[in-house]
């Protein structure tokens, strides 16, 4: 692209997609750049799958109230962690698919790659220089495990690894 775009959005997470919705109302002269998998952190490894896991935990916890309703046998209920995690992953995949649909029709205006700012109105991605009147930085977050924790001897789960566990 040799022309100066109206907007470049760096990041296709929740904030980047919110920016995209607003930008599309005003101009078609834009690109959105995403480094990593498309689909928001919220949908892929954050808010949405964690709420599905919490929902299962709450459902299991409520077994303690069954006797109030005349329901007997709650003491013999068990949780099937692999089944719970399979459900969480299935729901998560649906959540991600719905967020990815937001960018499917963008064609070459959706770029996979890591953006490197070169100035207030320029950046480089995949060896290509792009210029824009406005650059929105919405790069999101990623988990960090402090190095001393790696010596604790137990697996440390982050949002990037928790939902991939089998049991």
Give the residues covered by each predicted segment.
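Glycine-rich flavin
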Residues: 2-5, 22-28, 33-167
